[in-house]
A protein has these predicted regions:
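Phosphate/NTP-binding elements of NTP-utilizing enzymes
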Residues: 1-354
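Coil-to-beta-strand transition motifs
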Residues: 173, 358-362
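Generic beta-strand structural signal
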Residues: 160-162, 358, 370
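Metal-dependent catalytic core segments for phosphate chemistry
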Residues: 361-386
């Protein structure tokens, strides 16, 4: 039987096993479907389908091909969540969208399509849209992709004027601009949409402050949006960690947040990192924008190199790594451990040591205990962000 919307269709595929997703994606769709059924929020099919039709009829590929985009079911469901879930006043529920997804799954195209829709058809006169990143060069990636996307469509390109620092749509007084970090000078912004590219690479306090500045500036808009889209990365204590902590707390039921929409495409079982079925959980576009053969080749390389494996886990599995260079296999370390308690070693001879960090290093406390000719090691790591010291 036909489904009333793409959210239900995607959820049906998940629950019947036709579509392979990880636990976090399953949880968000369980939350959404339950919320629609019990009246926590409403679904506006007209708004959702309007965005989908616009993207598929006006937004073009801009690398390797120039035909119109054709959204996959997972993308149609995501667009439906962003633009179709509303409150009783028909105002969109979600103001922060956090998408974690594997490399080569169309992140930039998706972000560019969202920019195009909100610039041309969202009905916000005087909209200000920012492509944000630590450096202008990175911010320009999504910005330039958006421009190339609309450049291929005459009906859109004739309305847009590319100026020195932005793209301007006179008809709606809308400006789209790339923006590098400068939290001190961001207080005057009034964004309708902020697209944060590869937030996993945003370092420490700078990224956190810039995100909060832009988030606090959303208040003057009726239906604003911050879209953060990224693969996993290597940076600690940044906005990626913050968004991940908020997202997982929300999905576990430990948070009362209502405006955050996390779509976390990640593998569940790290030991199955080289299993194609498991990899589908982090790569919903497998077989479309990225082929299974590509993954087989990358797996073959990663199986022979710990550093390549760390990169593969990070970029294709979305399992965050502390370093791009691994010197110990995490599986080997994990299997070497035993489930023992420190309390079981009372009155034993022990030697302890601590590592007191001064900058961004890990702080650790370890103790080695000898009993019966066997050495037992207990280690505890304390990772403290600079902002908390």
């Amino acid at each position: 039987m036909p489904f009333s919307n793409y959210i239900y269709e995607y959820y049906d595929g998940i629950t019947t096993g036709k579509i392979v997703v990880g636990k976090w994606v399953r949880l968000i769709y369980e939350y959404i479907v339950s919320g629609l059924q019990n009246g926590l929020f409403l679904f506006n099919a007209k708004k959702a389908n309007k965005a989908i039709r616009f993207i598929e009829n006006f937004c073009h590929h801009c690398e390797g091909r120039t035909d119109l985009l054709k959204l996959e079911l997972w993308q149609k469901a995501a667009v439906s969540l962003i633009f179709g879930i509303v409150d009783e006043d028909n105002v969109r529920i979600f103001r922060e969208v956090f998408i974690v997804i594997g490399r080569k799954n169309g992140k930039t195209l998706f972000a560019s399509a969202v920019i195009a829709y909100m610039a041309y058809l969202d009905g916000e006169y005087g909209a200000k849209i920012y492509c944000l990143a630590p450096k202008l060069e990175q911010a320009n990636i999504v910005y330039d992709n958006f421009f190339q996307m609309i450049k291929k469509e005459p009906e859109l390109s004739e309305l847009a004027k590319k100026r020195r620092s932005d793209i301007y749509i006179e008809e709606s007084n809308t400006a789209i601009k790339p923006l590098a970090f400068n939290a001190k000078k961001s207080d005057g912004f009034n964004p309708h949409l902020v697209v944060n590219d590869e937030v996993a690479s945003w370092r420490g306090d700078g990224g956190l402050k810039q995100y909060e500045v832009m988030k606090s500036a959303l208040g003057a808009r009726r239906q604003p949006l911050i879209l953060s889209i990224s693969t996993a990365g290597y940076e600690n204590d940044g906005i990626f960690d913050e968004l991940m902590a908020r997202s997982t707390a929300f999905l576990k039921g430990g948070s009362k947040e209502r405006r955050l929409l996390p779509l976390l495409y990640m593998i569940d079982d790290v030991e199955k990192w080289n299993d194609l079925e498991e990899l589908k959980k982090a790569n919903p576009n497998m077989g479309v924008s990225v082929s299974p053969e590509f993954f087989k080749e990358e797996i073959a390389v990663a199986e022979m190199s710990l550093s390549k494996r760390a990169e593969f886990l990070c970029k294709y599995c979305n399992i965050k790594q502390n370093s791009s260079v691994a010197w110990l296999d995490y599986v080997v370390v994990d299997r070497a451990g035993e489930k023992i308690k420190l309390e079981d070693f009372k009155d034993s001879y022990a030697v302890g040591g601590i590592d007191l960090s001064q900058t961004t290093d890990l702080t650790a406390a370890s103790v080695i205990i000898e009993r019966g000719g066997v050495l037992y090691a207990f280690t505890q790591f304390f990772k403290i962000g600079r902002a908390h010291v």
